[in-house]
Amino acid sequence: MGKIIGIDLGTTNSCVSIMDGGKARVIENSEGDRTTPSIVAYTKDGEVLVGASAKRQAVTNPKNTFYAVKRLIGRKFTDAEVQKDISHVPYGILAHDNGDAWVQTSDAKRMAPQEISARVLEKMKKTAEDYLGEKVTEAVITVPAYFNDSQRQATKDAGRIAGLDVKRIINEPTAAALAYGLDKKGGDRKIAVYDLGGGTFDVSIIEIAEVDGEKQFEVLATNGDTFLGGEDFDNRVIEYLVDEFNKDQGIDLRKDPLALQRLKDAAERAKIELSSSQQTEVNLPYVTADASGPKHLNIKLTRAKLEALVEDLVKKSIEPCRTALNDAGLRASDINEVILVGGQTRMPKVQQAVADFFGKEPRKDVNPDEAVAVGAAIQGGVLAGDVKDVLLLDVTPLSLGIETMGGVFTKIIEKNTTIPTKASQTFSTAEDNQSAVTVHVLQGEREQARFNKSLAKFDLSGIEPAPRGMPQVEVSFDIDANGILHVSAKDKKTNKEQKVEIKAGSGLSDEEIQRMVADAEANREEDKKFHELVQARNQADGLIHATRTAITEHGSKVGGDVIGKVEAALSDLETAMKGDDKAQIEARTKTLEEAGQSLYAAAAAAEQGGSADAASGNAQASKAADDVVDAEFTEVKDDKK
């Protein structure tokens, strides 16, 4: 059995970790970084860029550079959160045939958010494979604790498209608690994990206890907001900069995708700088132009102004903390430690708000960017049997149930129930002689069914005719360790049963997933060919440069026929490099190498010939010297002078 890797698939950045010698180790990517931007770009020439390389070219390719797609995964296009996002991103978001939110490139290619996320997961997979020197096929992937069933299913689908068997989906705060608490001694403790990442917010109250020599991590309660994160903080800064520029220049930069992408980068940089300084300057020369000429943006931003812009967002994160504590039956004073996770928690205003609410300073010894991936790797180690004596008891974040008469939401499994779990409830018919019932499965907390998230609808038919209220239909809910739901309905009299694994009511069909898997495989082959072509071109380019240098240095020493052959080989290779035929480039590179060797050989021979002539002259001089007789001379004085 190979390694089960741990992946934190983040909104802004992703991270991969493995268990290595009993310790979790975060693996550096090919650029030498421990985290990878969750950004995917499609270039004009068909290349797919992932991570830092995609981020670097975002300003010049905004409509084909996709970031923060985690906020779209498993969502309907009509969701309020998706509609809000449309005005903040330069790329296209549109409705797929099933109502899901998909993204679109500038040449109208449509893709599911799962496909974009799969590209990031592939990069994480490759990072682990390069380090381990072996294939990786299994992973534990983290999701926000407050992700619903559709979003969890969609994340598993992304893993499948990336060629990964997702052994477990675990909640990000729970993973962070594993990373924090695995090696900690000192008895039972209750911790709060406040996880404010790039696009989502979670808080979990977790009890860490020693039970019969086993370390038990039990989630007591969880809450959150899957559309609150660093992206929203960035957007507040962008809106402020756009408004200030509009006041000054009368130009609305929201209509310019290129300017919007530059503003996004600048806003993120300014926000980060203001975590360690009191003031920064956003300076974007040539941000746009009008009839009067180019326009430059230069705006000072203070920490106080930033805090005023995002104050309501920070407050918005505190209410779920209050709810989670209440659900756990605890007070803030009962919490022993507060752990901060997610890059946005580096903001002093956020740290202060958390300290004020819990009445204690959050711990600073947990890396907010890496803790979640480390926890995922530990869970992978538990599943593989490499990590012993650890038990993880997670919960379902939202209540699950069905719609009953009058549009009422009847809960079958309450929120914060430890998973895996099963629960059943018996219902009956609403009309006389009803032969079928429709089971409408929902997730949420509202009393009215229509305000909750619809997960699935299915029919149980073949019920024997009887007066209303007589038939007994047992509806059973079964949540697995990934937090994914299976539902069955059974007529107790006839034992007829209908089972369904909840596929995100929207979501991808098996056929779509298979197509995307095949597409990813084809792209992997295409990417491999592309990189081989680039390597061949780079090698050829280096040889051309070296050969031209050799001609400059040695051309005067060799005959014209040798130089002619080298020049011809150079010209042939340069022509080949304009095309995409790798075999031709390699063949002509070899020809130039051989021509270059003949140039060096001719130059060396010419130099040796020169040396031989010099040696012959020296020999003659030596012989002449040998004929001279040594003599003593006596000075004769001329007295006649």
Swiss-Prot record:
Inducing stimuli = By stress conditions e.g. heat shock.
Ranges for the region named Disordered are: 605-627
Which parts pass through the membrane?
none
Q: Where is the composition biased (Low complexity)?
A: 605-623
Q: Which Pfam family, any one, appears in the UniProt record?
A: HSP70
User: One GO molecular function term?
Assistant: ATP-dependent protein folding chaperone
The Phosphothreonine modification is found at: T200
tRNA processing as UniProt keyword:
no
* Keywords tagged on the record: ATP-binding, Chaperone, Nucleotide-binding, Phosphoprotein, Stress response
Give the record's family classification: Belongs to the heat shock protein 70 family.
Role played = Acts as a chaperone.
Name-wise, this protein is: Chaperone protein DnaK
